[in-house]
C-alpha cells in the first residue's frame, strides 16, 4: 500500500432486523467468535473490522455511533488500537440513514474527506477475509466500489451492474430490464473508497442529498433534495458518483470469503459456519474458501 488511508465505519444504526438481539446491544457489538485461532478472545463485527483496517495500514479510523452508543464507547477503550468516535445525535435513528451518519463524520474536526487521504467508507455489519482489504487498498487511487464477484441470487443483496471501469447501477432486486441489460459485477460489499480528487464533490453531494446544516433554516437546501433526505443511505452517494462517471469497481472472487449480516438467520450462519471457516482459512492460507459457499 503506497497511499495514505483513513476509514469511517458506520455503527450508528439500530439493527432492528435482528430482533431481540439488538434491543440491549448494538448490532456492531454482536459477538462473532474468537479473534483468531490462537487468540480465543471473543471479538465482534466492529472490533474485527477495525483491527483489520489498522493491521492493513489504515491508521485513522473513525467510528460513527448512535444507538446504544455508550456500549461502543466503553468497548473501544479495551482495544489495542486507536480509534476516534463521532456521534450521530439524531433522537430517532429510524429517520437517520447511513449517509446522514457519514455526514456527521465529514463535518467533524477529524479531517474526513478533506483531500489529504484516500477515504474508506464501510458498513459495520460485515465480515470478510483479511486479504479483501488488500484488494481495495492496493487498487488505483480513484474512487471505487468494492464488489464480491460471487452472488447468491438473494434479492436482499445489493448488486452492481456495468463494467469495472464504468459501473452504472447499484441496488437490490434489479432486473435485466431495469439495468438496461448491463452485466452483473457482483455483490457490493458495503465498502467504498473516495479518492482525494473527489472529496469536494462528495461533500457537496452529501449536503445536497441529506441537507446542508449551514443553509438557512427552513430552506430546501437545509432539508435536502434527495427523496429520502436525512434517511438517505450511503449507497445513494455511490450511485450518484456512478452518474458522474467518477466511480470505478474493484472486484475479488469467491476465493476470499465475505458476508454481510442483515438478519437473525444470517447472524446464526456467521456464528455457526461462516466465521469458523474463515478463521480456519486465514490460519491455513492453502485452505479453500468453503466459508463462502
Tell me what each language-model feature is.
Residues 3-7, 183-293:
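Conserved alpha/beta core of the MobA/IspD/sugar-nucleotide pyrophosphorylase nucleotidyltransferase superfamily
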Amino acid at each position: 500500500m503506497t497511499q495514505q488511508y483513513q476509514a469511517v465505519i458506520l455503527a450508528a444504526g439500530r439493527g432492528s432486523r435482528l430482533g431481540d438481539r439488538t434491543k440491549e446491544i448494538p448490532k456492531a457489538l454482536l459477538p462473532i467468535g474468537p479473534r483468531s485461532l490462537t487468540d480465543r478472545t471473543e471479538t465482534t463485527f466492529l472490533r474485527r473490522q477495525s483491527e483489520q483496517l489498522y493491521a492493513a495500514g489504515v491508521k485513522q479510523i473513525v467510528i460513527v455511533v448512535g444507538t446504544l452508543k455508550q456500549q461502543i464507547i466503553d468497548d473501544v477503550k479495551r482495544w489495542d488500537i486507536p480509534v476516534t468516535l463521532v456521534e450521530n445525535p439524531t433522537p430517532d435513528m429510524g429517520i437517520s440513514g447511513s449517509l446522514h451518519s457519514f455526514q456527521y463524520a465529514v463535518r467533524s474536526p477529524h479531517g474526513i474527506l478533506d483531500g489529504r487521504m484516500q477515504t474508506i467508507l464501510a458498513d459495520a455489519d460485515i465480515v470478510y477475509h483479511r486479504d479483501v482489504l488488500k484488494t481495495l487498498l492496493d487498487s488505483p487511487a480513484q474512487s471505487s466500489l468494492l464488489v464480491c464477484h460471487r452472488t447468491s441470487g438473494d434479492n436482499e443483496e445489493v448488486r452492481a451492474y456495468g463494467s469495472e471501469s464504468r459501473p452504472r447501477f447499484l441496488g437490490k432486486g434489479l432486473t435485466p430490464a431495469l439495468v438496461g441489460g448491463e452485466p452483473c459485477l457482483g455483490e457490493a460489499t458495503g465498502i467504498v473508497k473516495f479518492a482525494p480528487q473527489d472529496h469536494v464533490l462528495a461533500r457537496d453531494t452529501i449536503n445536497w442529498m441529506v441537507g446542508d446544516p449551514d443553509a438557512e433554516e427552513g430552506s430546501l437546501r437545509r432539508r435536502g433534495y434527495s427523496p429520502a433526505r436525512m434517511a438517505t443511505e450511503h449507497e445513494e452517494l455511490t450511485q450518484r458518483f456512478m452518474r458522474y462517471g467518477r466511480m470505478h469497481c474493484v472486484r475479488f472472487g469467491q476465493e476470499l470469503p465475505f458476508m454481510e449480516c442483515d438478519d437473525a438467520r444470517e447472524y446464526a450462519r456467521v456464528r455457526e459456519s461462516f466465521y469458523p471457516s474463515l478463521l480456519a482459512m486465514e490460519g491455513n492460507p492453502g485452505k479453500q474458501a468453503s466459508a463462502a459457499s
